[in-house]
Amino acid sequence: MAADKAGEQGAEKHEDSANCSGISDHEKELSRSALQAFTAGNYEACLQHLGELKEINKDDYKVILNSAVAEFYKSDQTTTDLLKQTLNQLRNEVHSAIDEIDSLDDVENSMLYYNQAVILYYLRQHMEAISIGEKLYQFIEPFKEKFAHAVCFLLVDLYLLTFQTEKALHLLVVLEKMILQGHSNNKNGKNNETNSNANNREPFAQRGDGGVHVEAAKSKIHQYKVRAYIQMKSLKACKREIKSVMNTSGNSAPSLFLKSNFEYLRGNYRKAVKLLNSSNIAEYPGFMKTGECVRCMFWNNLGCIHFAMGKHNLGLFYFKKALQENDNTCAQLPSSNTDPGKKFSSRPMCTLLTNKRYELLYNCGIQLLHIGRPLAAFEYLIEAVQVYHSNPRLWLRLAECCIAANKGTSEQETKGLPSKKGIVQSIVGQGYHRKIVLASQSVQNLLYNDGESSAIPVASMEFAAICLRNALLLLPEDQFDAKQENGSKTSSQTGNTDSGGESSEVCSNKSHEGDKFIPAPPSSPLKRQEVENLRCSVLACSAYVGLALGDNLMALNHAEKLLQQPRLSGSLKFLGHLYAAEALISLDRISDAITHLNPENVTDVSLGVSSNEQEQGSDKGENEPMESVGKQMPQCYPSSVTSARTMMLFNLGSAYCLRSEYDKARKCLHQAASMIHPKEIPPEAILLAVYLELQNGNTQLALQIIKRNQLLPSIRMMSDLRKKPLFQTMHQPMQPIQMPAFTAVQRK
């Protein structure tokens, strides 16, 4: 772990300074003894030697630094706040800010900055840690080999956590050359070891087992490369490195987890599950030593695999198991100190990274949304958004929960109208006074506010509007100006449903393209194409919510913005025209609405954008394991261009009715009915036919349409009715039936 390196290097620092002129032999001996005691784990003796050194030279901040590190290890790494405070005080004595590290003179203070970077790493302040690490990397040449490796490994880990995979791969290449070159120099320099003074023999003695150190470093490099390639989805390069990992690490839990992730990306889900089950997680060190709950990762990864397989209920089961394991693990940790100055103390520093509750809540919420339990999903996601409030995709998911929770009778909408029960609410009276009461279809357009503030997080349409507004604000105005902001708190070990990887040769050619993304923790950052797709989805949902709330101007604004997007999928273009038409009809702009309802506007209803640009780093074009893979067609969605054009014609007929152009409306109705199966005709179309016949004075024909639950009676029935007078003359003026907006039953 990085903390171990921090302590070892911190204890070595003063020992190295003993070579400086003006230092007595007694100080050198004390320095050497302190290092030996620290390496042996005898922190009491180490502190005693450092105390004697401090009495000799009270102004040497390096002794204070080493004492702070030794005290930290003596407390089993539980005094994180005290160590952080000491390092900040020492830094203020040396420099007022990290930005002042601009010369080789700062090499003397490198150990102080490195220890600060390690603490920031465990506090999940990744960007601050990277800032320090990159400053140290500028002066890495004078550093000792082991310390230089520690700086590089820390930077690589930080780059991967912040999804800067290209920088990580470049640094791994440099690190690999550094290790091979250092190993070669050690072999050539063995003859000079006996001529070194006692102060220099100790570092050489530590590198006496250089072969073991080099092999361990190589194994770690291979694992980091696999993680980078997985992030960039470079499966060919990842396959090569996986072989190296298995050769160097064997069937250890980390190597099997990485190989399982690789098979998961390839779509070999059964093999990925088999690899996970073959890992012996019981032999892996406990979370108190590593800060990682392997059981939690195991269940989470199983949940992700079953999510990709479309087995959402089983995936939810595994995610809940992971959440339970995470809660049990956190319960074993000492309770946090109530003192604000000691909130990170009382437990090992590595355990500050143990809690993955909010990542798991996010996964559970997405899984529940796919299952069709929006209210339960809302409860999980509303808790996750308190931490990941900068994720626009998460705000969209919350809005989708609200929309789905307030959706109408989706079963009836999906299956069409199985019986007249769908349009007939009740029958009152008998004989001459017998009346048919038609069901109202306009309840969906009622406001949902019951007097509560719309800012209260409940699954209402008002709150959905707020969520969508937040999502739009978090997206960059110009998709080509998306900045590289990597301050995400994601963990590459938990296997979230979004992931990414590619070789250094390939990524170097695509660096400019890959740098354009915005963070979306706990998922992968959003790339340019993903930002465009997300904006289209948010605009479509915003138009739908605006219509549901009766805010027609806002709905029209969002629908028009949606239709102006340069890369718009056929499905969202279809919805954009429908939503714009409904808003225009509500605003009494029928002519403009008819323009949007032209069936020729629909040429494609695919969920994706046909593009020559493939996912960056994808070698084959495997399906990306995200929650938006679109493996199943959403309910209530037109399955073909024909059904979409039919929906357009039904709506166009309604628009013509509003202008009293009943012949055109009847023509649209007949044309639409001839394009689909009678069972697929929506109940609103039946009502439209009834309305047209009533306007034409054909009361009995309208009754027959309701009775037979068919859009048009048989030809024989129509000819018979033409010969007979109408059954009853209406004594009251005809009241037009309020036609529902067909787009209200559409859902993305």
From Swiss-Prot:
InterPro entries named in the record: CNOT10, TPR-like_helical_dom_sf, TPR_rpt
Compartment list: Cytoplasm; Nucleus
Region: Disordered, residue numbers: 1-25, 184-205, 483-524, 605-635
GO process terms (BP): mRNA catabolic process; negative regulation of translation; regulatory ncRNA-mediated gene silencing
GO cellular component terms given for this protein: CCR4-NOT complex; cytoplasm; nucleus
Biased composition (Basic and acidic residues): 1-17
Segments of skewed composition (Low complexity): 185-200
SUPFAM superfamilies xref list: TPR-like
Source domain of life: Eukaryota
UniProt family annotation: Belongs to the CNOT10 family.
Task performed by this protein: Component of the CCR4-NOT complex which is one of the major cellular mRNA deadenylases and is linked to various cellular processes including bulk mRNA degradation, miRNA-mediated repression, translational repression during translational initiation and general transcription regulation. Additional complex functions may be a consequence of its influence on mRNA expression. Is not required for association of CNOT7 to the CCR4-NOT complex.
Protein name per Swiss-Prot or TrEMBL: CCR4-NOT transcription complex subunit 10-A
Organism: Xenopus laevis
